[in-house]
Every structure is written in C-alpha cells, then in structure tokens.
C-alpha cells in the first residue's frame, strides 16, 4: 500500500481535521483552570525550589505537559465543543495520563475497547467523530475509519509524523527501518504501519545482537524467534539487513537512541567500508525536542543534592519510565507514581518499580530535613504535580514522621 498517497488523500478529505475548530481561546481557558497550578508557577519563579517545614522540593527545569500533548488535549476539548451532540470516540488513550483520560470520559468521549488483543471498531458508525490520539494511529485503523464514513480528528504529535516521514523515505529507497522502541507501544505500532520492511529493537542489547548477526551471521531461526513480534511480515535477516535506516519511538531514552544509531552506522561501516556506507545506511534526527529537554533536565537534577526522587506520570508512559531510569542509574531512591493518591498515610507510598508491578513501600521519606526531587512525564498536568507536592508536605510536616 502507498501509505504516503493514502495519507495525502485522507488529509484532503472534508471529513479530516488536524487544525482544530476555532475554539482555541475558550478551550485554553478551560484547560488552564483544570490543569495549571499557581503553586507550580511559584516554584518555577523561585528557581525551581520550594521549602515548607522540613521539606525542600527541587523541581526539574523541564517537566510536565509538552507542546504536542497540550495540543492533542486541546483538540479533544475543541472536538467535544464543536460536535456537542455527535457520538465521539477515541482510538486509544489521548495521552498516557489517567486524570486526563478520565476527564474525557466525563465529557462523554468513548474509548474503543480492546477485546482479545484487538480494538473493537464495530461500535463505530458512519457519521461518528473519531479522535486519533497524540501517539497516532496505524494506517489500517485510519483506512477503516475513513471507509466507515467517520469524521476524523487527528491529534497526532508532529514529532511522531516526522518519524513516519522518515520510515516512508526508508521504504521508498528499499531500506529496512530499524525502529528503536517498544513494539507494543501505540506510537511504534503506528510508525511500523508506515514502514516497508522493519525491525523493532528495544534497547542497546538487542541492537548489538542484530549488529553481530550483520557482521558474523548466525542462526536465522533463533533471530526470528527473538524478534517474533517485532518485525514486518516475511522479514529475513539474511536479506533485509543490507540497507538500513534508523528511526525511533519519540519517547525513548535519547542517549540510547543515539548509541543505537551510532552502533548501526559503525557496523555498516565495518561491513561495507566508507565509500559504500551511504548506500547501506541512512539516519534522520527524529529525537523529540520535548523528550530531550525533559531528559536533560533530569540529568541535571540527579547531579544535585537529593534524598528522594518522585517521578510522576502514567504507569504506561514510556517517557516517564525513562526519567525514572535516569534517577535509578544515579543510585537515588526513586518512586514512580501516577497521582497524589499513591502517597498513603503513615509514610507509605504505592509506586511502580522498573519492569515490576505496583508495590507499597513503608518509611519512604527519611527522618529530619529532606530534599525531594520532583519531575513529571510529558503527559502529566501541573495540577497533578501540585497535588503530589502538597501530599508530601502534608505527610512530612504533619507530625506523622519523627
């Protein structure tokens, strides 16, 4: 399928909307009321620090809602206002934040249910309005919704669209797209649908395995079993690793994406030499600015004096998880929570360790005066960050801890 031609045709349709509906001013007023925080603004203006009693909060200098997320949420609000009576669906969570998604449910926006691993689009009828989330949607989903005669509101982040353009360039020149990402993540599912031949690698370890195969060969069956859910149909590592292009899920760890790109470039250089490199390797910078800014701010924060780190964001948020990784790698006691309700009375906290289920930690706040580092993922409103900080102050300064 010519995905580029389909996308162009869809964008020219009267049923396709990507620029809102002219209600920006009113919607931004509503969003400011629901999601902004006067306390967080004060902390920003106070050099990202705030003290109450025995607690000093240090905020990362870049955190929370990014432009792409704010744009997606605003478009969803505009859609409800512009279509007050129509049935509105969204193909997935608008962003990975439970409070924002709950707000959309309260606005009578339906979420497409997943049944036996597949989305049930049978509930969508002609004339319904369907929102595509910030992560985007697969070509198959867009085609299905277009064929049904739905009004499509596309809130896909432009940074994600940039990655799609990159893999389409790979496809046009018969390059295999090496996608650094999580093969089940909505964004990577969408990106791979625009690619031709592709392989998804999760991390540097998997990338090294692929590069070793390129240089030394190996067991094809073992390779295909290792990546059984992470490649295009009919993928053959003996034929499809000769010309490679690099792309990434925009929320992955920036430093690892760069390392993976460099590793593949070096591998192809060894395999084919400098004069042939450009015939076998291509790379475009598709690292999201907002992801990079938040990770850089976290790298700075972990170098400061911090007793405990709190990372706020949806548990299924990839960019939030990578912020957590930065803190853990520095050896800081770090707690990933999705709301203030995870901070329990009696100095307890429900949190999600990396690659584990939610667990409860007792005595998580140390005795005496403490410095708590705080950051949040790109899908987390300031209001949620404020609520978490207020709970920390409440627990620590209310005489609960001695």
UniProtKB/Swiss-Prot annotation:
Q: In which pathway does it act?
A: Isoprenoid biosynthesis; dimethylallyl diphosphate biosynthesis; dimethylallyl diphosphate from (2E)-4-hydroxy-3-methylbutenyl diphosphate: step 1/1; Isoprenoid biosynthesis; isopentenyl diphosphate biosynthesis via DXP pathway; isopentenyl diphosphate from 1-deoxy-D-xylulose 5-phosphate: step 6/6
Taking the record's annotation, the residue ranges forming a coiled coil are: none
The protein's UniProt keywords, in alphabetical order, are: 4Fe-4S, Iron, Iron-sulfur, Isoprene biosynthesis, Metal-binding, Oxidoreductase
**Pfam families, sorted:** LYTB
**Which residues are annotated as active site?**
187
Q: Which cofactor does it need?
A: [4Fe-4S] cluster
Which GO BP annotation is one of this protein's?
dimethylallyl diphosphate biosynthetic process
Which top-level enzyme class is recorded in the Swiss-Prot or TrEMBL entry? Answer: oxidoreductase
Q: Which family does it belong to?
A: Belongs to the IspH family.
Name used for this protein in its record: 4-hydroxy-3-methylbut-2-enyl diphosphate reductase
This protein's species is Crocosphaera subtropica (strain ATCC 51142 / BH68)
